[in-house]
Amino acid sequence: MGIRAIVVDTAGTTTDLSFIKDTLFPYSAKALPDFLKENEHNVLVENCICDVRDIALEPEATLERVIEILQQWVAEDRKSTPLKTLQGLIWKQGYAKGEFTGHIFPDFIDAIEGIKQQNMRLYSFSSGSAEAQKLLFSHSDAGDLTPNFDGHFDTRTGNKLFKQAYCNIINTISLAPKQVLFISDVIEELKAAEEAGMRTLQMVRTPGQRTGTYKQISSFAELTF
């Protein structure tokens, strides 16, 4: 059964981890307090604030307390949906202002054409919000790459470390598990995808990176179908 869709992780796979950690995260952490104060009555932001209170079990938390909670989650790199949604909204402003462009590895940019020529579908799956993924790929160093994607999955689909998230992706795109290839640098994600029946490849871009028993590539140029 041939591969008909490729699902790619972002950080460490299509995008340099340092761009996420050294550019995007610090930018959102610095902008977060003012952004919440200026937009607390925006419906989407208001919903995120309510979700933070619910998750933290602090229904009466003030806005200042919500900001404290979010900053703690940033420090802990929590994969919380309201945090990821707010980060995406903040990054949207940063991209629009030209504060930065989205880093994408050149080998992935080059591989996209071959993937589409094979009539394969292309999806991304990240703990960052789908909106943040669209921003990354639409404001990339190589321009707007989003027309090449058939969809983006985030924490609303499920936790990347658990099988159910990948089962949900398979159900959403209506393909057999073995028709889907998942590429990530994280062993635990590959394990979960494999448990769901997907084919897997580990992206190994850095020396000393944790590796397992999965087939490995160090560049999208090594993809063969």
Curated annotation (Swiss-Prot):
It comes from the Bacteria. InterPro entries: Enolase-ppase_E1, HAD-like_sf, HAD-SF_hydro_IA, HAD_sf. The keyword Cell inner membrane does not apply. One of its GO terms (biological process) is L-methionine salvage from methylthioadenosine. Monomer. The gene is mtnC. The keyword Hydrolase applies. PANTHER family: ENOLASE-PHOSPHATASE E1. Pathway: Amino-acid biosynthesis; L-methionine biosynthesis via salvage pathway; L-methionine from S-methyl-5-thio-alpha-D-ribose 1-phosphate: step 3/6; Amino-acid biosynthesis; L-methionine biosynthesis via salvage pathway; L-methionine from S-methyl-5-thio-alpha-D-ribose 1-phosphate: step 4/6. It comes from Shewanella sediminis (strain HAW-EB3). This is Enolase-phosphatase E1. Belongs to the HAD-like hydrolase superfamily. MasA/MtnC family. CDD domains: HAD_EP (cd01629). Binds 1 Mg(2+) ion per subunit. Gene3D superfamilies: 1.10.720.60, HAD superfamily/HAD-like. It catalyses: 5-methylsulfanyl-2,3-dioxopentyl phosphate + H2O = 1,2-dihydroxy-5-(methylsulfanyl)pent-1-en-3-one + phosphate. Keywords: Amino-acid biosynthesis, Hydrolase, Magnesium, Metal-binding, Methionine biosynthesis. Its cofactor is Mg(2+). Its EC number is 3.1.3.77. Bifunctional enzyme that catalyzes the enolization of 2,3-diketo-5-methylthiopentyl-1-phosphate (DK-MTP-1-P) into the intermediate 2-hydroxy-3-keto-5-methylthiopentenyl-1-phosphate (HK-MTPenyl-1-P), which is then dephosphorylated to form the acireductone 1,2-dihydroxy-3-keto-5-methylthiopentene (DHK-MTPene). One of its GO terms (molecular function) is 2-hydroxy-3-keto-5-methylthiopentenyl-1-phosphate phosphatase activity.
